[in-house]
Structure formats: structure tokens, C-alpha cells
């Protein structure tokens, strides 16, 4: 089978939104070439367990590559993707050039090329994220491994927002806690919470592909006795109370449910949010405070923030 590689040149701010647009358009896989990976702070702190080739990354901006089977409707699909991306500035998301290029790739190249972007990464004092196809031996008994197979559909679990969420969970999760993960994606945050001692984790995503991916990764990490995965829109119809909610979503989506989060998380419980570009920190903090939360801590990495807030 022939595949088309759709490359979109954009900004780091727009990565999650553009990736979501591509998934919704039916991409069978997405790879992200971000030059920030070459100089990330965590390389000094923890050390990525591989060497990156600068020649494979754009000089500026971010290149997002998505893979679609070649069909008669591909041109319409690309036009729809472009239209959706062009709308993002109306949500204050800078898209950069937004240039789109198309290349043909063979199935055998498509099936393996994306794996070069994904290697074991130690993202905190506790966790190392390891792809299923690589062998890795923990450096200490305390080191916890999260195995992920993104299935060509979701990220590697090493984006700054995911890293900060996991570090926030390390700071806050207590043995026996009950947790909800909103917009679970690959399920990485739910798996981390389970490995930190949570007794029950409910993981939700609106995207059925995400639900399938999360279920697979939860089983892979042998946390399916703790983590349940389901399809749901944010916190609609979800009852509490739970000890903690974690949501790694775009700021614009987080703004849709602070009141629901305050309803579902118990009094004194925590709401961890990320996916927030630094410029949106103030508006998110104000929305959380309006819903009754107190901001306890803000984590920062590159141009992103994560917020730990406590319910009244």
C-alpha cells in the first residue's frame, strides 16, 4: 500500500492542536520534529538515553508529519486539515507559516520511520518512559518504568506538558487516592498515577482511538486492575467525589470545565492542569480561582506551565 506523508510547519504552541486536527482527519500516525528536543532542560537534569541528530529537525518552528493512506479523497482531507488549522489563530494559537507539503512513502518505510523519534527517556526522579520495542534495564530499584506503544496515534509521553503533569502527580498522589484523568490520550498519566499508589483511576477521552490506545497501554503496564478507561466528553455526567483530577489539555478546553472539576473533586482535593502555553497562565488561573480553587503551585518548562490547584 502507498501512503502519503503530510508535513505541516507550525509552532510549538500549535503542536497539540494541529496533532488533534490530524488525528480527527484520520491520520494513521503522527510524528513531531521539534528542535527544542535537542536542548531540553531535562537532558541536563535527567538525561535522555539516546543521541538526537540535529539534521533531522527543522531550523525553526516545529514540523508535524502525519501519515494517510493514498485515496481518491486525500486532496479533500488535506483541504479540510488546512481549513481547521487556519481557524486556530481565532483561538489565539499562533500557527507560524502553516505550510503543508505532501510526500509519498512505502508501507514498510511508514511502519518503521516514525520509531526513530521515540526512545527511552527518564523524565523525572521516578519515571522512565520506554517504547515497547526497546530493551531497557532500570538503573535502580526505585526507578519506575512506563512502557508505551503509541500505535502511531499519540505522542511519546515526553512533551513538556506531560512531563510536568507526571512530576505534579509525584508531588501529590497519596497511596489509596481516587483519581480521574480527563483527556487521557495514550493513558500515560493514568498509568503513572497507578504506579504511584492510587487505588482507582478513571481515564476518559472523547476520541475512540485514544480509548483503544489507552486500554492497550494500561494492559501493557499491568495497571488494568486499577485503571478503567472509557469514552466521555470531559466531566459530563461524571460523579464524584475523587481525591484528584488531572487534565493535560489545551487551555481553551480546560476553560470549559473548572466548575465541573470543582463539583467532582472533593473538598480539599486537587486539580492538576497542563497543556497551557505560558501566555494563557493568567486566564486559566483566574478561571480556576473563580470556580473555587486555590492555586498551590505552578510548574514551568520551556514555554509551558502546569498548575496544581486545591478545591475549597
From Swiss-Prot:
GO biological process entries: methylation
Residues noted as binding S-adenosyl-L-methionine in the record, renumbered to the chain: 162, 183, 205, 248
Enzyme Commission number(s) from the entry: 2.1.1.-
Recorded GO CC terms: cytoplasm
Disulfide bonds: none
SUPFAM superfamilies: S-adenosyl-L-methionine-dependent methyltransferases
Keywords for this protein: Cytoplasm, Methyltransferase, S-adenosyl-L-methionine, Transferase
Entry-linked Pfam families: PrmA
Main location: cytoplasm
Catalytic activity as recorded in UniProt: L-lysyl-[protein] + 3 S-adenosyl-L-methionine = N(6),N(6),N(6)-trimethyl-L-lysyl-[protein] + 3 S-adenosyl-L-homocysteine + 3 H(+)
Subcellular location: Cytoplasm
Family named by the database record: Belongs to the methyltransferase superfamily. PrmA family.
Function text: Methylates ribosomal protein L11.
Record-linked NCBIfam families: prmA
Protein name per the record: Ribosomal protein L11 methyltransferase
Species per Swiss-Prot/TrEMBL record: Bacillus cereus (strain AH187)
Amino acid at each position: 500500500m502507498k501512503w502519503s506523508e503530510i508535513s505541516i510547519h507550525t509552532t510549538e504552541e500549535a503542536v497539540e492542536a494541529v496533532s488533534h486536527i490530524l488525528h480527527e482527519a484520520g491520520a494513521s500516525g503522527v510524528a513531531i520534529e521539534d528542535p527544542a528536543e535537542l536542548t531540553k532542560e531535562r537532558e541536563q537534569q535527567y538525561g535522555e538515553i539516546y543521541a538526537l541528530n540535529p539534521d533531522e529537525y527543522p531550523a525553526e518552528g516545529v514540523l508535524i508529519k502525519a501519515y494517510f493512506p493514498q485515496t481518491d479523497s486525500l486532496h479533500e482531507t488535506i483541504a479540510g486539515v488546512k481549513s481547521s488549522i487556519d481557524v486556530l489563530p481565532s483561538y489565539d494559537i499562533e500557527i507560524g507559516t502553516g505550510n503543508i507539503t505532501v510526500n509519498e512513502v512505502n508501507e514498510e518505510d511508514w511502519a518503521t520511520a516514525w520509531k526513530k523519534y521515540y526512545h527511552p527517556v527518564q523524565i523525572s526522579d521516578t519515571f522512565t518512559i520506554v517504547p515497547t520495542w526497546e530493551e531497557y534495564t532500570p538503573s535502580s530499584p526505585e526507578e519506575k518504568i512506563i512502557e508505551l506503544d503509541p500505535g502511531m496515534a499519540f505522542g511519546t509521553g515526553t512533551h513538556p506538558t506531560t512531563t510536568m503533569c507526571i512530576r505534579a502527580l509525584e508531588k501529590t498522589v497519596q497511596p489509596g487516592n481516587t483519581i480521574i484523568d480527563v483527556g487521557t490520550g495514550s493513558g500515560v498519566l493514568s498509568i503513572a498515577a497507578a504506579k504511584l499508589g492510587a487505588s482507582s483511576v478513571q481515564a476518559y477521552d472523547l476520541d475512540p482511538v485514544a480509548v483503544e490506545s489507552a486500554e492497550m497501554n494500561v494492559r501493557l503496564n499491568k495497571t488494568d486492575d486499577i485503571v478503567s478507561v472509557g469514552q466521555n466528553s470531559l466531566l459530563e455526567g461524571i460523579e464524584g467525589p475523587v481525591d484528584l483530577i488531572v487534565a493535560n489539555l489545551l487551555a481553551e478546553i480546560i476553560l470549559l470545565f473548572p466548575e465541573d472539576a470543582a463539583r467532582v473533586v472533593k473538598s480539599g482535593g486537587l486539580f492538576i492542569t497542563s497543556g497551557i502555553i505560558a501566555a494563557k497562565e493568567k486566564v486559566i488561573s483566574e478561571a480556576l480561582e473563580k470556580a473555587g480553587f486555590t492555586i498551590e503551585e505552578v510548574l514551568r518548562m520551556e514555554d509551558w506551565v502546569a498548575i496544581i490547584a486545591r478545591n475549597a
